[in-house]
Amino acid sequence: MKNFNSLKTTLILAFAAITVVSGFSACKKESDAKPTISQVAVSMGGFSQLEAAAIRGGVAVVLSNKNPLASSGGAYTVFAPTNDAFARLGLVNPEDLNVLQKSFLTNVLLYHVNNGNTLQTALTGGASIPSLLGPAKRIINRNGEFYVNGSKILATNVAADNGTVHVIDKVLLASGANIAQTTIFFATAKGFTSPELSFLLEAVLYCDLAGALSDATANYTVFAPTNQAFKDLGTILGVPLNQPSDIRKLPRNTVTQVLLSHVFNLTGGGKFTSELNPGIITALNGKSVTLGAFVNGTLTVRGSGNSAAANMAIPDVQTTNGVVHVIDRVILN
């Protein structure tokens, strides 16, 4: 996964403008100097987890000067997740960040930053916003409220000496790779320090669906069950699924149909939560799946065979051929 594994010094320096380290006050020589992005973030409060993430990600170097890139006008734009945004992922305290690989964390942070001043006037529905990581972000208008991917924009145009800050309610995630590669990335513990989606990966390989999920011309919406979701499925079926290879105890056709119930070719391509509406959607295998109400930025997902709906554990992971939402139950039809 090229974007996850190749970090450039210039990108690391770029994100440093939103972090705080010792010696910070020395950068401000005059009492009337306009605050930097880092000073603005600290003064607003509620961004201590973002600071801790930047430090752990190896990008905690304060820039007292402006963006050196000539075309940037000396500015950066930062979409800044609040502490509550990190808490959605279970990252409540600084030590919780240890569950993320450092290189992954760094790339996550860089996805929130772009060169130049991107003001609110540019945040219109359908707009594409670049990032220092590479993949672009999408601005979505949902009933008059604006989102960047699936993250609601809470505040805009917070001015700084070296750019602009917009406040958002979710951490933005992008893999820079296709759906199959993204699954491999997490299953091999390159994102989290413990493997995740490894049961899903085994199922995809067992059913020979990796090619379909790698299709560069596709633009799928995928609901990806966690490892625990597959273990729970084993309990339901009476077939212990204690490790990924146990998936092969089940008939291949059965597993194939289960997997296809999680993949959707929706009109307009892969959908972020901000683009999904309550109601019935049709999976690749023709089965109907019900989306629940849009509450606090997520929706539940339920098949006709589920006794309870699945919740989104990690929503809105952007890939090169769709959007992945990690869920806590396997969809059954």
Question: Language-model segments: which ranges?
Answer:
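Mature, structured domains of secreted/extracytosolic soluble proteins
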Residues: 2-9, 13, 21-333
